[in-house]
Amino acid sequence: MEKSEKKPMRFSFRRRPKSVSVDRSEAHAADVSIGQYLEKLNYVSQEEAIKIDQELFSEYAYSVDQLMELAGLSVATAVAKSYPRGPMPKGGTVLVCCGPGNNGGDGLVCARHLKLFGYEPSVFYPKQSNKPLFQNLTKQCQEMEVPFLSFLPDSQLVSDSYNLVVDALFGFSFKPPVRPEFNDVMDKLKKVKIPVVSIDIPSGWDVETGGDADSLQPECLVSLTAPKRCSRNFKGRFHWLGGRFVPPALAAKYELNLPPYPGTDCCLLLTPPPS
């Protein structure tokens, strides 16, 4: 028998037939008012936040650096949406104040992404961790020429030199009062005359009840994974939800009732845009 001659393989680039149904649920969700979701949104307790984190690491096999990267990127994106680089004076300067824990790691990731977004971040990281993860995050910033401050200037100099401050000092595991070595830092941040963006929890706040009249009052808050109970008392201009990594089954288990993120965005504005 003669071997049949092989025909060259051809690829078709024709348009999809009009009769094919396309799922537009995500696009539709972006158009739906956020208000209807806020009524059901679950503001989690400190205990719930800890359990959710533990399950992300164990049941869902996330690593700390994975979640930190996604969280820090969402914070940087929320900053860019709230305070666009274009019209920003002072060369787009931003001061990122990092604490010794995972919240500080989120801040380091945020600083790196802000640099990539065209801002000029500086980092104040007074109590650096000796863990490899944090040392790597620090080196990544340094290799991208993000300067690290050896001390925190007074409030007026910070206000004159920077456009805004990212507060990455303490996260949802914090329990008042503030440790003595951070009292001076907190006092200076409370007195700055530029916007403060807090990551997950305004530093110094009780995770359940919030802060008092003497507490840090950020203009922008980026809640991660799910908003914490204290954020009900947030009165600033921008409240974002970030950290788009919660598996649907986990969200259902804790009845988080998270609103759908628009399109491919990694952060979602929970408050109406200021006029």
UniProtKB/Swiss-Prot annotation:
Q: Which cofactor does it need?
A: K(+)
Tell me which residues bind K(+): N103, D167, S203
| Annotated EC | 5.1.99.6
The entry's family comment says: Belongs to the NnrE/AIBP family.
Looking at the record, the residues that make up the YjeF N-terminal domain are 49-258
Q: Which UniProt keywords apply?
A: Isomerase, Metal-binding, NAD, NADP, Nucleotide-binding, Potassium
Q: Which PANTHER family does the entry link to?
A: NAD(P)H-HYDRATE EPIMERASE
Organism classification: Eukaryota, Metazoa, Ecdysozoa, Arthropoda, Chelicerata
* Disulfide bond sites: none
One GO molecular-function entry: NAD(P)HX epimerase activity
What is the recorded function of this protein according to its Swiss-Prot or TrEMBL entry? Catalyzes the epimerization of the S- and R-forms of NAD(P)HX, a damaged form of NAD(P)H that is a result of enzymatic or heat-dependent hydration. This is a prerequisite for the S-specific NAD(P)H-hydrate dehydratase to allow the repair of both epimers of NAD(P)HX.
Family annotation (HAMAP family): NADHX_epimerase
Main enzyme class: isomerase
Q: Where does (6S)-NADPHX bind?
A: N102, N103, G104, G105, D106, G171, F172, S173, F174, K175, P176, P177, D200
**Catalytic activity as recorded in UniProt:** (6R)-NADHX = (6S)-NADHX; (6R)-NADPHX = (6S)-NADPHX
Q: Name one GO cellular component term.
A: mitochondrion
| Lineage top rank: taxon | Eukaryota
What protein name does the entry list?
NAD(P)H-hydrate epimerase
Q: How is the cofactor bound?
A: Binds 1 potassium ion per subunit.
